[in-house]
């Protein structure tokens, strides 16, 4: 008795034909069945393999059927948008591996050089050509295989990975600005210096800059360009409503990296103690804030509009010249080529408190330009007087644009000059008069762009 039964001679069931269904009823029935099966498999794939699946189907009536493993709909739309923009990062994607790699030195040829790579694999169904000897009747049965192709895309950098640079907020009403030179003591700054290539002619601003810079307001000896600063043409200074004395800001470390260049103890006894001012910007030390327009009058400290000094700066008349001095002489005094110093004699200088001229009369003028009498800086832009206890300071800042670092006398130490070394005619009740100090306001050797002289009455 033969234990092994003979092989079955019954023909095997033919493979299912994959062809277009012409009958509308059968087509709708097959669509519903296959659609539910596809969605079921997509759900199983998302649960078993931690995959995010979105299935989108358009039927013959152009109706859309969508399944998403991500809920709610916003996450589904975000997933589709990621694919359209290629805004995702694939973990260690491998490119086409070359089997003929001679050594390990060429492994980087098939690995991505850029870490931010989006890998997209596209699948397609193609007929299988394995049965080349099949009869014509067998060709009616579809034999296909699934093939895939992978492409790599460089993804855009996200905002969180961008290098954080301190932004500069500019109000809408401020339309015109002047580029200011950088201080040589500034370190680690990301703000570009004044516009222009200072190779041969430092007084010619760059044509690509959108800001107007008066050539006479730039000093070639005081304009510096840092090696580590990105080259950008548009430099907009930081606007601050209040000026504080150097070293008095509570958040000094966050606002500037400027250090003192000289110690108060190292200064000679004949020179008053000097404090340095800054503008609360990381790239500017000793520069000035903006002053109002000549036609706007006095600014209320509570008002927000601040108009910088524009191209009409050269048309401002000097405030301290005698009335009988003609306009031609005024221009000669303040010509950039004429180094003549302006001499202003206050008739009652010795009677002024603390040796300072009245706030509305004292103006610090550079050789580049002068300020008009009605161009008075608002009080909120003056020195913060709360930190000075010995001798309060009251000074205005009408025309400091165009100068770089300026050291001003903010505190007078009368005890620093022994009275025994001063002639008797310059002592009043044993105390030196103000005329002893008045010529020491500005160090002309350090800052040649500021030209001021005072004579005792």
From Swiss-Prot:
Region Disordered, residue ranges: 195-278, 295-328
**Is DNA damage among this UniProt entry's keywords?**
no
Spell out the CDD domains in the cross-references: MADS_SRF_like (cd00266)
The record's annotation in SUPFAM superfamilies points to: SRF-like
Q: Post-translation: what modifications?
A: Phosphorylated. Occurs periodically during mitosis.
GO BP annotations, alphabetical order: cell division; positive regulation of transcription by RNA polymerase II
Has the keyword Cell cycle been applied to this entry?
Answer: yes
Signal sequence interval, chain numbering: none
Listed A to Z, the keywords are: Activator, Cell cycle, Cell division, DNA-binding, Mitosis, Nucleus, Phosphoprotein, Transcription, Transcription regulation
Where does this protein reside within or beyond the cell?
Answer: Nucleus
Q: Which residues form the MADS-box domain?
A: 11-71
Which sequence ranges are marked TM in the entry?
none
Alphabetized Pfam families for the sequence: SRF-TF
At the top level of its lineage, which domain of life is listed?
Eukaryota
Extract the PROSITE patterns matched here: MADS_BOX_1, MADS_BOX_2
**Where in the sequence does UniProt note compositional bias of the Low complexity kind?**
199-216
- Phosphoserine: residues carrying this PTM: 372
Tell me which GO cellular component terms the UniProt record holds. Answer: cytosol; M/G1 phase-specific MADS box-forkhead transcription factor complex
Where along the chain is composition biased (Basic residues)? 265-278
Q: Which GO terms describe its molecular function?
A: DNA-binding transcription activator activity, RNA polymerase II-specific; DNA-binding transcription factor activity, RNA polymerase II-specific; protein dimerization activity; RNA polymerase II cis-regulatory region sequence-specific DNA binding
**Residue ranges with Polar residues bias:** 218-234, 295-317
Briefly, what is this protein's role? Acts as a transcriptional activator with a role in the regulation of mitosis. Regulates septation and the periodic transcription of cdc15.
Q: What is this protein called?
A: MADS-box transcription factor 1
* Originating species: Schizosaccharomyces pombe (strain 972 / ATCC 24843) (Fission yeast)
Give the organism's phylogenetic lineage: Eukaryota, Fungi, Dikarya, Ascomycota, Taphrinomycotina
């Amino acid at each position: 008795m033969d234990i092994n039964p003979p092989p079955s001679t019954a023909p095997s069931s033919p493979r299912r034909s994959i062809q277009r269904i012409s009958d509308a009823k059968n087509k709708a029935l097959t669509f519903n069945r296959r659609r539910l099966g596809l969605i079921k498999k997509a759900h199983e794939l998302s649960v078993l393999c931690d995959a995010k699946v979105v299935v989108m189907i358009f039927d013959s009536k152009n109706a859309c059927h969508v399944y998403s493993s991500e809920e709610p709909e916003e996450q589904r739309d975000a997933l589709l948008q990621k694919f359209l923009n290629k805004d995702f990062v694939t973990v260690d994607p491998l490119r086409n591996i070359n089997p003929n790699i001679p050594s390990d030195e060429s492994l980087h040829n098939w690995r991505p050089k850029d870490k931010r790579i989006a890998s997209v694999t596209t699948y397609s169904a193609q007929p299988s050509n394995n049965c080349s000897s099949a009869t014509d009747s067998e060709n009616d049965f579809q034999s296909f295989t699934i093939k895939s192709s992978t492409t790599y895309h460089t993804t855009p950098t996200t905002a969180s990975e961008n290098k954080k640079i301190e932004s500069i907020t500019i109000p809408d009403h401020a339309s015109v600005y002047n580029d200011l030179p950088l201080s040589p003591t500034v370190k680690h700054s990301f703000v570009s210096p004044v516009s222009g290539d200072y190779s041969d002619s430092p007084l010619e601003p760059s044509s690509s800059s959108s800001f107007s810079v008066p050539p006479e307001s730039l000093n070639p000896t005081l304009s510096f360009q840092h090696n580590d600063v990105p080259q950008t043409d548009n430099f907009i200074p930081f606007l601050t409503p209040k000026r504080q004395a150097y070293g008095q800001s509570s958040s000094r470390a966050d606002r500037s990296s400027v250090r003192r260049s000289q110690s108060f103890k190292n200064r000679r006894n004949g020179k008053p103690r000097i404090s340095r001012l800054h503008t609360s910007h990381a790239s500017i030390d000793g520069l000035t804030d903006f002053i109002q327009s000549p036609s706007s009058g006095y600014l209320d400290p509570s008002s927000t509009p601040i108009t910088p000094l524009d191209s009409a700066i050269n048309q401002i008349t000097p405030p301290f010249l005698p009335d009988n001095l003609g306009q031609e002489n005024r221009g000669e005094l303040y010509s950039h080529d004429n180094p003549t110093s302006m001499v202003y004699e206050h008739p009652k200088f010795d009677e002024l408190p603390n040796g300072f001229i009245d706030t509305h009369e004292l103006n610090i003028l550079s050789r580049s330009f002068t300020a008009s009498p009605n161009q008075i800086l608002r009080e909120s832009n003056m020195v913060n007087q709360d930190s000075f206890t010995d001798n309060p300071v009251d000074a205005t800042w009408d025309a400091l644009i165009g100068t770089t670092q300026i050291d001003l006398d903010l505190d007078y130490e009368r005890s620093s000059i022994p009275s025994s070394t001063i002639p008797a005619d310059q002592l009043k009740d044993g105390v030196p008069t103000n005329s002893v100090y008045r010529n020491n306001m500005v160090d002309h050797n350090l800052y040649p762009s500021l030209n001021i002289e005072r004579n005792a009455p």
